[in-house]
């Protein structure tokens, strides 16, 4: 049990005003200056943090301060202790993973979200929050030219989740419960789900959380000749084998723009198979979906009208800050039936009238933030035209990098570029042992990242180790791409001459 602190200072405690408007105004101005200076000087920091594991614990006290500390002292410690341990995702020299894009518009939208601190679990708790989210989800659906079956103006609807993981989990639970109504809960062990060996790793995690047995997760092999896209014929064979074995096909997750190489699963032929067997057909377009607001890329979503759900993450490419994943479903009632809660303390007339949407029933948790403000500010501040230009600019810079790679015979493009990701490797001796080539590229990756000037990552697909160069950080310009290529070539020179 605890004990009363005999040194408790009631006078000092009584002076604490956690939200005094003028003090907030002063500190907020200081923080905005701090953030603006950080963005302005971000290139002065190593892109990839150079600290060792456990570095921070030795720098900070073992216990929280008993007395308040000046705001200026806290900011000073951010400079001294926190920034050295930050990998700078907003650096224009960050070419790793996929980008987490930002903008001034999204930032001020986030400020308002934090300002209101509304917990919009149902309509009554925050009417504007719920209704604005419905509006921006329909706006984005229109930008993507989704059918009305996915919009609130039509028969479907959309909700902002935190990440793709949550979007997949929610739709998987909805599909599971719908199936179990027919076959009985005791048959959950018969449910089988499908994806490719390029489907994001979060899929398996969501399946485990939804009670799908690991042995019932089908990860269908893809081939380099098909650019690692999921084969409808292979899917059909897997399903046929499962049906013959008495299993129950449940769910298919296709991907438009896989994480490793941006492979694109062709939706229409996959929909043929999924619809024939009554699978819930989900499309994960977390990264590449945003590009489909550009007419020249929209065809990658052809067939989406035959899917049950679609998710994409504006925080990756639509300047919207983390976290923001948009999920659309054709039949919201199926999702709501699986995820709804109705405790007495949340009962209210608008909800009971069925005239409003309660987003708590569209997600795993109950509480939710006013994330729609970020998208609303971004869409209104930049307009569709500028968002399209932003995406096209990133893709053009990736094309430029691709041309650099093709101009040096020591390097090769491993997988055809589609969007703003270039998958390449150093392969100066085309007939050399693959193990030696992999080791050489591992060394090149380590050399480049150790400089702190650039950060890139790798993947391994079809047994081939390759480097990933993902253009997309908000501040990246052509000269950053040129400088990154120059550094990569220097690394290759150093390794090949050693």
UniProtKB/Swiss-Prot annotation:
Pfam families: Pyridoxal_deC. It is an enzyme of class 4 (lyase). GO terms for biological process: amino acid metabolic process; carboxylic acid metabolic process; indole alkaloid biosynthetic process. Induction: Induced by methyl jasmonate. PROSITE patterns: DDC_GAD_HDC_YDC (PS00392). CDD domains: DOPA_deC_like (cd06450). Its cofactor is pyridoxal 5'-phosphate. Keywords: Decarboxylase, Lyase, Pyridoxal phosphate. It comes from the Eukaryota. One of its GO terms (molecular function) is pyridoxal phosphate binding. The modification N6-(pyridoxal phosphate)lysine is found at residue 316. One of its GO terms (cellular component) is cytoplasm. The keyword Lyase applies. Its EC number is 4.1.1.105. Belongs to the group II decarboxylase family. Involved in the biosynthesis of tryptamine. Supplies tryptamine for the indole moiety of camptothecin (CPT), an anti-cancer monoterpene alkaloid. Represents a key step in monoterpene indole alkaloid biosynthesis. Is specific for tryptophan, and inactive against tyrosine, phenylalanine and 3,4-dihydroxyphenylalanine (dopa). This is Tryptophan decarboxylase TDC2. It comes from Camptotheca acuminata (Happy tree). The lineage of its organism: Eukaryota, Viridiplantae, Streptophyta, Embryophyta, Tracheophyta.
């Amino acid at each position: 049990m605890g004990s009363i602190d005999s040194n408790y200072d009631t006078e000092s405690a009584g002076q604490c005003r956690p939200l005094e408007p003028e003090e907030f105004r002063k500190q907020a101005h200081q923080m905005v200056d701090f953030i603006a200076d950080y963005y302005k000087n971000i290139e002065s920091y190593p892109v990839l943090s150079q600290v060792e594991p456990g570095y921070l614990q030795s720098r900070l006290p073992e216990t929280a301060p008993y007395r308040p500390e000046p705001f200026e002292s806290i900011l000073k410690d951010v400079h001294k202790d926190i920034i050295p341990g930050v990998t700078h995702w907003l650096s224009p020299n960050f070419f790793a993973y996929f980008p987490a894009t930002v903008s001034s518009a999204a930032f001020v939208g986030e400020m308002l979200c934090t300002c209101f601190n509304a917990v919009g679990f149902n309509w009554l708790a925050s009417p504007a929050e719920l209704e604005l989210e419905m509006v921006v989800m329909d706006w984005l659906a229109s930008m993507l030219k989704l059918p009305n079956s996915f919009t609130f103006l039509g028969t479907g609807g959309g909700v902002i989740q935190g990440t793709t993981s949550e979007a997949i989990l929610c739709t998987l639970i909805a599909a599971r419960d719908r199936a179990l109504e027919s076959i009985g809960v005791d048959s959950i062990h018969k449910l089988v789900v499908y994806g490719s060996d390029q489907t994001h790793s979060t899929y398996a995690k969501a399946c485990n959380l939804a009670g799908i047995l690991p042995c019932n997760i089908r990860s269908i092999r893809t081939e380099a000749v098909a650019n690692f896209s999921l084969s409808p014929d292979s899917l059909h064979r897997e399903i046929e084998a499962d049906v013959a074995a008495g299993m129950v096909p449940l769910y298919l997750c296709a991907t438009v723009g896989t994480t490793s190489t941006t492979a694109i699963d062709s939706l229409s032929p996959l929909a043929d198979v999924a619809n024939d067997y009554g699978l819930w057909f989900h499309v994960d377009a977390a990264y590449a979906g945003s590009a489909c607001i550009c007419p020249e890329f929209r065809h990658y979503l052809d067939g989406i009208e035959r899917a049950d759900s679609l998710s994409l993450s504006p925080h990756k490419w639509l300047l919207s800050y983390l976290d923001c994943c948009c999920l659309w479903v054709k039949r919201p009632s199926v999702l709501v039936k699986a995820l709804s809660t109705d405790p007495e303390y949340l009962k209210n007339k608008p909800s009971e009238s069925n005239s409003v949407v309660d987003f708590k029933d569209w997600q795993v948790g109950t509480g939710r933030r006013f994330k729609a403000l970020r998208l609303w500010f971004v869409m209104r501040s930049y307009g569709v035209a500028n968002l399209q230009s932003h995406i096209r600019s990133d893709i053009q810079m990736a094309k430029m990098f691709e041309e650099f790679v093709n101009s040096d015979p020591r390097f090769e493009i491993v997988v055809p570029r589609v969007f703003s990701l270039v998958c390449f490797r150093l392969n100066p001796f085309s007939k050399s042992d693959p193990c030696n080539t992999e080791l050489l590229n591992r060394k090149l990756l380590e050399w480049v990242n150790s400089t702190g000037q650039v950060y890139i990552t790798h993947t391994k697909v079809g047994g081939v180790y390759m480097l990933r160069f993902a253009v997309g950080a908000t501040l990246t310009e052509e000269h950053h791409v040129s400088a990154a290529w120059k550094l990569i070539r220097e690394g290759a020179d150093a390794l090949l001459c050693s």
